[in-house]
Amino acid sequence: KRNPEQFMEMQSGGLYGLVFEDNSMVKEQRKFALKTLHEIGFGSAALEDSVHSGALEVVAEWIKSEGEVVDVAENIEKAIGNIVWNITFGIELTFDNDIVEQFRQYQQEAIPLAGTPLMMFLELFPPLRKLDFLFGNKIKRLQELLDIIGSMVTEAIKMTEQSFDMDNQPRSYVEAFLREMKKNKDAGKAEGNYTYQQMHSSAFSLWAAGFDTSVGLLRLCILELVNHPEVQRKIHQEIDQRIGERRIRNEDQKLLPYTCAFLQEVYRVGSVLPINFIRQTSQDTEIEGWKILSGTNVLPQYSMVHSDPNEFERPDYFRPERHIEDDNFVKDPRITPFSVGKRSCLGETLARMEMFVMIATFVQNCRFTCADEVPPPVEFTYGITRAVKEFSVRIHPRN
């Protein structure tokens, strides 16, 4: 059972969205979201084509650098941002649009603020907000950023409302939600849980979560390739021998076990969600002798398993080979980058497909090397999500 959180209250102005309490509203809305995402193409060839096209646009921009020092983040953000924007709002953006960049700037400032110890304490003691001035008005600044991003979501919804023909099949989450609202209204039904606030909060969450986590993991992939050139060579060889120059498809995972092992090791090392959402026990329970009463706030940290030496030998070492047995990739249930249970990430299917198709396409076409003689360190920044610090590389075309 989830406990209502102050951060989400600040974002939504109430208990809206897809990540709140264990009640009928959340169950209904998650079911609607999963059904909608499936209907608009999660797992479809069309969506995979869109991801592959985005990857090729990134490669084309990188190759223009002609081996000069570049930050890989900008073009990855454009590609992922366009995909998630289209899924959320049904609006196709050009690769060089500035909407994604505006979102990124505000979100980049908001995420570390949302993950500060101050916000953790605010979840447990809401009156702390009145003492915000003692901590540099960080809560106030976070609220300002959330309001700005929220207003941008509002404008995006308006664009969708103006362009979407209700007689057509929805192509996005917001279009499907608008159609459901109209259906209830036309039938003379109460709006129930299909309110504007619910749509806005859910669209906000789908966009923010789908953008930040995928970008962070893809950047970490590039950083690990640069720091481990022997791993990069093995992936090059595997793709050259088993795929050649034809386009990468998601179904190629069965042909590329080492590439899959590399990605699973990135998920383990990256732990993109280091601190999960606050939960609440629904009944008295006991864990290793510790009694936990019903209604107690708990904060499960699944990522601790990823770095546990009792689970993984020498966990500080990046070693894709730990996920290979008899030349086959072995999926490890202990590695949970998208959380677990009924409230695991709604976009996990898309995220895993994005990661595989994009990284395999990047490595098929590019070779990544250090910007300087010393490889960039693998260092993280922390917030609601965890991401590697800024770094630069040199990118060389393989063909």
Where on the chain are the PLM-derived regions?
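Cytochrome P450 substrate-recognition site 1
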Residues: K1-L47, D71, I76, I80-I83, ...
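Cytochrome P450 heme-thiolate "Cys pocket" and heme-binding signature region
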Residues: G14, F204, A209, E288, ...
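Conserved cytochrome P450 catalytic core segment spanning the I/J/K helices
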Residues: H38-F42, G67, T116-F121, R141-L218, ...
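Cytochrome P450
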Residues: G41-S53, I63-N86, T94-F103, P127-S151, ...
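Central I-helix of cytochrome P450 enzymes
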Residues: I80, V84, L145-T154, N184-E238, ...
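Conserved cytochrome P450 K-helix E-x-x-R motif and the immediately C-terminal K′/meander segment
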Residues: S151, E155, E245-E288, P309
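Cytochrome P450 heme-binding "Cys pocket" and the immediately downstream C-terminal segment
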Residues: P229-Q232, K331, T349-T385
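Conserved cytochrome P450 K-helix/beta-meander segment immediately N-terminal to the heme-binding cysteine loop
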Residues: P300-D327
